[in-house]
From Swiss-Prot:
This is Ribosomal protein L11 methyltransferase. Its EC number is 2.1.1.-. It is an enzyme of class 2 (transferase). It catalyses: L-lysyl-[protein] + 3 S-adenosyl-L-methionine = N(6),N(6),N(6)-trimethyl-L-lysyl-[protein] + 3 S-adenosyl-L-homocysteine + 3 H(+). One of its GO terms (cellular component) is cytoplasm. The keyword Transcription does not apply. Gene3D superfamilies: Vaccinia Virus protein VP39 (3.40.50.150). GO terms for biological process: methylation. GO terms for molecular function: protein-lysine N-methyltransferase activity. Methylates ribosomal protein L11. The lineage of its organism: Bacteria, Thermotogati, Thermotogota, Thermotogae, Thermotogales.
Amino acid sequence: MRFKELVFLLKIDEEELLEKLYEEGFFNFAIEENKEGDRLLRVYLREGETLPSFLSNWKILDERLTTPKDWMVELEPFEIVEDVVVDPTEKVTRTDKIVVKLSPGVAFGTGLHPTTQMSVLFLKKYLKKGDRVVDVGCGTGILAIVAKKLGASYVLAVDVDEQAVEVAKENVQKNSVDVTVKRSDLLSEVEGVFDLVVSNILAEIHLRLLEDVSRVTHEKSILILSGIVDTKEDMVREKAQKKGWNLLERKQEREWVTLVMKRS
C-alpha cells in the first residue's frame, strides 16, 4: 500500500494536535524533532483520503509517495523497558529478553513514546500469568503482544481505525502469538470478563471508556490508563472514582501521565 506523506512544521502543542486529529478520526501521523530542534508533523494519506481540515492552511514543507517499509529503515532495536526489546528490523534473536517484532506502519505506537513505555512497565508489574487482557485502542498492537508474551492466557486487541487493525494483525503474525484483533469503537464489540484492561488513548476518550469498562471487568481487575496529558489527569481520576475505580499507582514522564486502578 502506498501513501502520500506530507510534512508540516508543528505550530501547536502536542495535546491540542492530538485532540484535533482524533476529533476528525485521523490516526495516520507521526511527530518528530529534526536536527535543528523543530517539531515536525508527518501525515500519511491513503488514496482518496482527504487532509484533516485544520491543516488546510498549514504550509507543506515536503511531500512524497511512500510505503510502510520506508518508515522502518531508520528505526533500530531498542529496549522499551528493562528486558523488553522492540525490534523493527526483525533481526534480534536473543532469548533472554522479551522481543517484540514491530512494523509501525502508520498506526500510533512504535514504543518510543513515553505513554507506551509506561504502559509496558505497568503490564510487567501487574499482569499475572493466565490473565485475560484487553487492549483498547491497540494501534500497532504492541501492548497486546507484550501482554501475551508476559503470559496472558487470552488477549484481545481492539481499535476503531481499520488501518490500525490491519497493522496490529500483521504484527501479531510477525510475533507468532495468539492475539485476537478486531475493529471496535472502544468496548462496543467486546464481550466477556477481563482481569486486566490497558488503554493508551486520549483523556477524553478514557472518559467514554470508563462509562462501560465495569461491564467487562470484575472486582479484582486492573485498569491501566495511559496517554493522559497532566492538565487533564484530574478529570479522568474524578470520573474513574465516580465509576468505582481506586488509584493504585501513578507515573509521569514529561507531560504524560499513566494511571493504574482497581475496582473499589
